[in-house]
Amino acid sequence: MKLVSYKTEESEHLGVFVDGHIYNLNSCDKLIPDNMNAFLAGGEELMDRAKKISASIKGGILAAKEEIFFELLAPVPHPSSCRDGYAFRQHVASARRNRKLDMIPEFDSYPIFYFTNHNAIQGPGEITCMPDHFEKLDFELEAAVVIGKKGRNICAAEADDYIAG
């Protein structure tokens, strides 16, 4: 199942992406909130409802109205927090070397992350660049993991239970 956040006119919505089309989940089931944050706060019950709707649309059981005029947003447009992790050793070593810094000795010992600006999350579309900063840009692959329920000091064996997507 692929969930999307999108905007029609001035309102943000939560949808499911099926076979190249977006369908509003709240229109299919009024118990599902019409935004990603409230949906994620609803936990597994809402996730299960959304999966059933997605399967019903895919299987032709539910004839849902497709959204036609929309703007895609970031999947979670207003996250409550955001962390960025150091994932690729080669990239970190190269970036540090370019700044004349030694590699972080603890890199291989435990996960390294930092808190980043959760208000800077953007969806697809035009990106405004600052030309005077091009020499300092550091391009890299980014991946997101959306946590769907509260937890603290979660062991690796239980981590998948906390991932919403």
Residue ranges: model-predicted function:
Residues 1-11, 17, 31, 38-165:
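Active-site microenvironments in enzyme catalytic cores
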Residues 23-36:
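A hydrophobic, small-residue-rich beta->alpha segment in the mid-to-C-terminal subdomain
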Residues 12-26:
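Short, surface-exposed terminal/edge motifs of secreted or surface/virion proteins that either
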